A protein has these predicted regions:
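N-terminal, motif-rich segments that launch catalysis or mediate targeting to/interaction with membranes
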Residues: 1-101, 119-201, 206-214, 221, ...
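Short alpha-helix carrying the canonical HExxH Zn2+-binding catalytic motif
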Residues: 99-107, 111
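C-terminal ends of transmembrane alpha-helices
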Residues: 113-119
């Protein structure tokens, strides 16, 4: 891929939501795939902003889950479908910036259920959820290497051809990830991970999640392609030379942003660990997303 792509992936992207959305662009296929890739890379700020908006702006946390063992409780498929429609409308109008933003938002709802902890709910998971996500973010480069070197590379992923194709795709992601839910709980080492997040995950976790990363990236690429086809417009040619220069100049700023976010993650995990050691549970220091999902799950599933 291009220098610009590498700069985005390795320096600008601060979360796995960012990385998966950008990685999907490299897997695009079709006659106009290079144009679409370059266009969305040029609109990377909107794409990455959208990819985190469900967490930072909308905070509609029920839409971030799909619990396969509870009759597919959660709103991820419907949320993804809503933002697919917005993406297609924006592309039809040639509003490339908003189209990229919508693509980022949609990607969040698609890939969240491919994280096993977004497919179920247990007390044990709540204790380590934030720590596991921190560890998986920090070990992404290693898991990417495992995918390419040991697991056969990017997988073949296909979409259904009916009206519910996107909802079925989101459900397929949850079905693929949920079998690893218990493995993450049993194998994650909180004592190690709270200090050095890369050490919290063992080889089996890394191998399984590497496969999920591959599925998520290619699934997103196929979804983007379907949206491009539905929009039925030709993307403009763009030159990324100036954009590459600007991103390169901003690398120090991006690294500072990464360091700040890492410090915030560490503080969150440390607080949860301290509460767990003191009380045997995690309640007061749960993240807002976990608190909301836990409350809604109790009201809508456990008490139903």
């Amino acid at each position: 891929m291009s220098v610009f792509f590498d700069l985005l992936l390795n320096t600008v992207c601060r979360s796995n939501h960012h990385r998966l959305a950008v990685e999907a662009l490299a897997q695009l296929q079709g006659n106009d795939s290079e144009r679409w890739r370059d266009l969305f890379l040029q609109q990377y700020e909107a794409l990455l902003e959208g990819a985190k908006a469900p967490d930072t702006v909308f905070k509609d946390f029920k839409n971030h889950v799909l619990h396969t063992r509870d009759n597919y409780w959660g709103g991820a498929p419907e949320a993804a479908e809503e933002w697919r429609k917005r993406m297609v409308r924006a592309l039809k109008d040639r509003d490339w910036k908003y189209g990229a933003y919508c693509a980022g938002v949609m990607s969040h709802y698609v890939v969240d259920p491919i994280q096993p902890f977004h497919t179920g709910q247990t007390e044990e998971e709540g204790v380590i959820h934030a720590a596991v996500e921190w560890s998986l973010s920090k070990t992404y480069p290693e898991m990417r290497k495992i995918l390419l070197a040991d697991l056969g590379g990017w997988p073949d992923v296909r979409l259904a051809d009916d009206a519910d194709w996107l909802k079925k795709a989101v459900r397929a992601g949850a079905d693929r990830s949920n079998p690893h839910y218990d493995l993450l709980i049993q194998h994650y080492n909180l004592e190690l991970g709270r200090k050095k997040p890369e050490q919290g995950v063992d080889q089996e976790i890394k191998d399984k999640v590497a496969g999920l990363i591959g599925f998520a990236v290619v699934l997103l690429a196929r979804i983007f392609e379907r949206c491009f086809a539905e929009a039925a417009v030709q993307p403009p040619r763009v030159n990324l030379a100036v954009d590459t220069l600007l991103v390169g100049l901003n690398v120090p700023v991006a690294m500072v942003a990464k360091a700040i976010e890492n410090a915030q993650d560490r503080a969150q995990v440390t607080a949860m660990y301290q509460e767990f050691r003191k009380t045997g549970k995690v309640r007061q220091t749960l993240r807002d997303d976990d608190k909301e999902v836990r409350a809604l799950y109790a009201a809508e599933v456990l008490k139903a």
